[in-house]
Amino acid sequence: MTKKKVHKPGSATIALNKRARHEYFIEEEFEAGLSLQGWEVKSLRAGKANISDSYVILIDGEAFLFGANFTPLAVASSHYVCDPIRTRKLLLNQRELESLFGRINREGYTVVALSLYWKNAWCKVKIGVAKGKKQHDKRSDLKDREWQVDKARIMKHAGR
C-alpha cells in the first residue's frame, strides 16, 4: 500500500495582478491552464513570475497570454534560449473560448490575467472579462475602502 502525500502548508498563489482590480471592473472569471516549457515550470516553482502587464488575446479561435514575465533561473538549460516574455497558449474548452470571444467583441471589454496559482501539480491562471474604470470610479472605490477600515476601527474601540 502506498503512503498518501502530505500536503505542504503554504500558499498556492504564485503571482497576483492587484492592478487589474484597481483599473477594471471584473465581470466574469475563468480558470485556464497554461502550455509551459520546462524552464518556465522551474521558474514558477521558485516564484519568479510577474503578470501585472499581462492580457489575453484570441487568435484563430485560440487564447494566448501576452505580457506575462517568467524570469528564467540562473541554472536553467544552457542549450535552450529562454524568452521570459514569450506568448503562452491558454488551455480552455471550446464553450469557454466562444464565451470569451463573444464578450471581447463588445465595445470596451478586454480579458486580463488576475492570478497565477498551483492547482495540484498544474499551473493555472485566473482570467477575467473586464471593463475599464474611469478616474471617478477609482476614487469612489478608494473612499469605500477607507470607510471600511475606519468602520472596523470604530467597532473595535466601541466594545471597550
UniProtKB/Swiss-Prot annotation:
Task: State the Gene Ontology terms under molecular function.
Answer: RNA binding
Q: What is its subcellular localisation? A: Cytoplasm
List the Pfam families hit by this protein, alphabetically: SmpB (PF01668)
Q: What cellular component GO annotations does this protein have?
A: cytosol
Q: Which UniProt keywords apply?
A: Cytoplasm, RNA-binding
Gene3D superfamilies from the UniProt entry: 2.40.280.10
- What residues form the membrane-spanning segments? none
Tell me if RNA-binding is a UniProt keyword of this record. yes
Q: Which GO biological process entries does UniProt record here?
A: trans-translation
Q: Show the PROSITE patterns listed in the entry.
A: SSRP
Q: What is its main location?
A: cytoplasm
Annotated function? Required for rescue of stalled ribosomes mediated by trans-translation. Binds to transfer-messenger RNA (tmRNA), required for stable association of tmRNA with ribosomes. tmRNA and SmpB together mimic tRNA shape, replacing the anticodon stem-loop with SmpB. tmRNA is encoded by the ssrA gene; the 2 termini fold to resemble tRNA(Ala) and it encodes a 'tag peptide', a short internal open reading frame. During trans-translation Ala-aminoacylated tmRNA acts like a tRNA, entering the A-site of stalled ribosomes, displacing the stalled mRNA.
What protein family does this chain belong to? Belongs to the SmpB family.
NCBIfam families associated with the record: PRK05422.1, smpB
Name of the protein in question = SsrA-binding protein
Gene name, Swiss-Prot/TrEMBL? smpB
